Amino acid sequence: MLHLEDDNGRQRSVIANLQKFVYCCLYLRFIKDGSLFLILLGWIISSLCDFIQELTLRYLKKNYLEVGRDNDQEDDESLAIRGLETPIVRMIINKAIRYYQGLILLETAYCIVYHIRLDVSRDICSKPYGFVIMLLIREFTCPVPTAFPSKLLLVLLDILLLFCQIVIINGSLSSSLQNVKLIVKELNAEEEGALNILKLNTWHMDATGPELIVLKNHDKSIPQQADGDDATEITPLLNIAE
C-alpha cells in the first residue's frame, strides 16, 4: 500500500510543478508580447484544471474512502462534501471539458492572430519592461536585427504552454487517492493520447456526462464502474459483474 500512496503523491506533485511551470511560461510570454488577454486566458485555464482536480479528489474521498468513519465526523463534514454524487460529478466534468475545449481554442486562435500581427519594433521596443526585468532569456533587442527570429521564442512558449495545459487537464481528470484511481472512460488517453480530450464531443454525449471508472488497487486493478448510485465491480479476467 505504501508504494501506491507514494505514486499518488508523486502524480499530484508532478501536476503541481507543471502548474508552476505554466505560470512561469505565462509570465515570460507576457514579458515578450505584452498581451494581458493571453495571460488572463492562461490563468483561467489553469484555474479550471485546479477546480477539476479538486473535484475529482473530493469525489473519490467522499464516495470510496469513507468506509469506517464514525457518524459524528461524517455529520460534521456532510455540508462540505454534499453534491458529490456520481450523476452530478459527471455533468460537472462534462461541462468543464466543454469549457476547457472552448478556452483552448480561443487561446490558440488569439495567439496565432496576435503574434502574426505583432510588430516587435513598434509594440515591444517602446515598452521598457521587456528589457530591464528579464535579461537571461535572450530578450528582444532594439532595433530588431533582420536576421534574428524575434518571434521564435513566442512560438516555442505557445507550443510549450499548450502541451503543459493538455497534460495537466488529463492528469486532473485521472486523479488518484490512496488505493483508488478515477478514469474518464471516453477520454481513453492511454490508447488515444492526451490530445484526445480536444476531439471529445461533449455536445453529443449522454446527458448525464462521461462515464467514470474507478480502479481499486489491491493485488490487481479491479475496475469499478461509477455509473450510478451503486457502482458495480467487474472482474477483468471473467468480464462479468459480481
From Swiss-Prot:
Membrane topology, record value: Multi-pass membrane protein
Compartment(s) of residence: Vacuole membrane
Stretches that traverse the bilayer: 128-148, 152-172
Main location per the UniProt record: membrane
Key words of the record: Membrane, Transmembrane, Transmembrane helix, Vacuole
Source superkingdom: Eukaryota
One Gene Ontology cellular component annotation held by this UniProt entry: endoplasmic reticulum
Subunit description: Part of the vacuole-localized DSC E3 ligase complex composed of at least TUL1, DSC2, DSC3, UBX3, CDC48 and VLD1.
Function text: Component of the vacuole-localized DSC E3 ubiquitin ligase complex involved in the targeting of the complex to the vacuole membrane via the AP3 pathway to ubiquinate vacuolar membrane proteins. Competes with GLD1 to determine the subcellular localizations of the DSC complex.
Identification of the protein by name: Vacuole localized DSC protein 1
Source species of the chain: Saccharomyces cerevisiae (strain ATCC 204508 / S288c) (Baker's yeast)
